[in-house]
Amino acid sequence: MQIVTDPAEMQATADKLRAGRQLIGVVMTMGALHEGHLSLVNLAREHAGTIIMTLFVNPSQFGPGEDFQRYPRPFEKDAAMARSAGVDYLFAPTPEAMYPEGFQTTVSCSGITRRFEGERRPGHFDGVATIVSKLLNITRPHVAVFGEKDAQQLALIRRINRDLDMGVQIVAAPTVRENDGLAVSSRNIYLTGDERQKAPAIHRAIQHAGEMLAAGENDLKAVAAEVAGMITENTQFKLEYAAFVDEESFEPAETVVKEHEYRLLIAAAAERVRLIDNQKFRV
């Protein structure tokens, strides 16, 4: 595995790979790697022969009071995990390299981002859209793999890829879960012991939503309300939202239309970390 820190060098390397007819797959991370990230690498390998992993804690997607300074950065461990997973190039630039003096451009997508995470984290998705656009331009991939756990982010990336004619195949990877159902996340280390015990209640509530829909419930607002009640009752987390959206448009959905796909989105705040989860349903 080759470690690259200079954007120009990474871009030149990617251009050479493309000239040699190598299919490039990219997996973007902020480090603190876990099994979820490794599953993205495995999926990327099914679509491409050369895998680039980006490792960059992006300051522009963190808001005031968020965890940019304390976000874990175990670089040596991450590099070892990437190497063991079969990553060919680890692109790990500095903030100064990605946002040099005089940098002025922001990529913004107003529709998909105006609710849910976008409403609660102002500026977050502008930071995501900007850095993803830059990293796609630098790594020149044919395929980019992103996890479904960050569903709104995935919808945003699909939209900017489409709107800006980037021509990258965006592949969605299923959420990886712990044995008790908790979605794997680098930030789970912030949970206290008691919070960690109660956190799987979120996934149980999602499963209950699936049971309600399978039994013929058509009122998505009622299903979401029951999900919210289960989470509030079984945890001390502050529920921020539990809502269904149309899978294609990401607009809020209230009533089932048969043979249609919806996604249940959930966010709940523990003492030091926000937990997000989601699930797609076809009804």
Swiss-Prot record:
It catalyses: (R)-pantoate + beta-alanine + ATP = (R)-pantothenate + AMP + diphosphate + H(+). InterPro entries: Pantoate_ligase, Pantoate_ligase_C, Rossmann-like_a/b/a_fold. Beta-alanine binds at residue 61. Its main location: cytoplasm. Pathway: Cofactor biosynthesis; (R)-pantothenate biosynthesis; (R)-pantothenate from (R)-pantoate and beta-alanine: step 1/1. GO terms for molecular function: ATP binding; pantoate-beta-alanine ligase activity. (R)-pantoate binds at residues 61, 153. The reaction proceeds by a bi uni uni bi ping pong mechanism. Homodimer. HAMAP family: PanC. This is Pantothenate synthetase. The gene is panC.
